[in-house]
A protein has these predicted regions:
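The serine-hydrolase catalytic nucleophile loop
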Residues: 73-84
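Conserved alpha/beta-hydrolase
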Residues: 86-106
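Conserved acidic catalytic loop of the alpha/beta-hydrolase fold
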Residues: 117-135
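Conserved hydrolase catalytic core segment
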Residues: 134-178
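Flexible "cap/lid" loop of the alpha/beta hydrolase fold
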Residues: 162-203
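Alpha/beta-hydrolase
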Residues: 189-272, 276
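Conserved loop-alpha-helix segment in the C-terminal half of the alpha/beta-hydrolase fold
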Residues: 268-310
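Catalytic active-site module of serine/aspartate enzymes centered on a nucleophile-bearing elbow/loop
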Residues: 303-335
Length: 335
């Protein structure tokens, strides 16, 4: 009899445990259940209404992370490594393709590609997803870090926390670091050839692209042989909206050139205005100065810094354990 009662109790526990552990993936009470977490959000812009694509993973009423991809003009795909880390910590997160990016509408009007308009878009996305200061966390990588910062300057009262990944608060400083710190580390002959192509603005030349891809990218963008770059990242790069990228960032990989929208962007003097918890992340071999990313964490009122000693611009891939242990630790420590 005792043995029977013991077996019954074990059976009951085994039936109950999955309900508790699977609540993270229980979409039964969510309005996006039919679409598996996908929500298409209409966005009002100065030239009309367009749709942007989002997809939710998981349930956590207190920790909801909106992912802001880089580029500008890239897409959510390279964030897919997060699926190896956030679910096991029960962190709810949202993929989101910004207007002009892969799964979202792609209007051609260049007047849309401004920082202020993208900030307004993020606020409309927040409202549509019903995120608020009790649960709303932004993780912005590269250009997404600029967008996250700018959103926080205008709407920090809507945020629980902000994570700025692999981005500095000044494009002029980024340009200086690329040209005067990283470029001289290249083989002199390689750098000479790169500069020759850039001097005549021949950025699409196959040799120029080959020099960048074989000598610069594996050192500072992702420290892996090109043939080993992960598929989600390759898909994201392949599907990048080049029109947005060139309009905002410019065609050069050594900073921002020409009349690109971001060329003069600098927010160093405004960092002290930010009160929310902020994590900045820098890679030792990044295209941007990790020391400035650390400095940024000290300028804001409630900042912390995560250094990835093996990481480059995509530290989430080439220093993955350090990166995600730090990110999930920061999120879990939030009230």
């Amino acid at each position: 009899m005792k043995k029977l009662l013991f077996l019954i109790s074990i059976s009951l526990l085994s039936c109950q445990s999955p309900n508790k552990s699977n609540s993270y993936l229980d979409y039964s009470e969510r309005s996006d259940k039919l679409s598996g977490g996908v929500k298409i959000i209409p966005i009002n812009t100065p030239i009309g209404k367009f749709n942007v694509w989002t997809k939710r993973i998981g349930n956590n009423p207190a920790k909801k992370v909106l992912l802001l991809h880089g580029g500008p003009g890239a897409n959510h795909e390279y964030f897919q490594a997060i699926e190896s880390f956030f679910p096991k910590e029960s962190i709810e997160f949202y993929y989101y393709d910004q207007l002009g990016s892969e799964f979202s509408d792609k209007p051609k009007d260049e007047s849309l590609w401004t920082i202020a308009r993208f900030v307004d878009e993020v606020e409309q996305v927040r409202q549509a997803l019903k995120l608020n200061k009790e649960n709303f966390i932004i993780l912005g990588h590269s250009w997404g870090g600029i967008l996250g910062l700018e959103y926080a300057f205008k709407y920090q009262n809507n945020l629980k926390a902000l994570i700025i990944s692999n981005m500095v608060p000044s494009i002029p400083d980024y340009i200086d670091y690329a040209n005067n710190v990283l470029a001289p580390k290249l083989d002199p002959e390689v750098l000479k050839r790169i500069r020759e192509y850039e001097s005549v603005e021949d950025y699409s030349n196959t040799e120029y692209l080959s020099l960048i891809e074989n000598h610069y990218y594996p050192k500072h963008v992702l420290r892996m042989p090109l043939e080993n770059w992960p598929n989600p990242l390759l898909r994201s790069l392949t599907n990048t909206n080049k029109d947005i990228y060139v309009r905002m960032q410019g065609p050069s990989e050594f900073g921002v050139v020409g009349d690109a929208v971001l060329k003069e962007w600098d927010r160093k003097n405004d960092l002290k205005k930010l009160k929310i918890p902020i994590l900045t992340i820098g890679g030792e071999y990044d295209t941007m100065d990790p020391k400035q990313m650390e400095w940024m964490s000290k300028e804001v009122q409630n900042g912390s810094y995560l250094h990835c000693p093996n990481g480059s611009h995509w530290s989430m891939y080439d220093d993955q354990e350090n990166y995600f242990n730090g990110v999930t630790g920061f999120i879990k420590a939030l009230p």
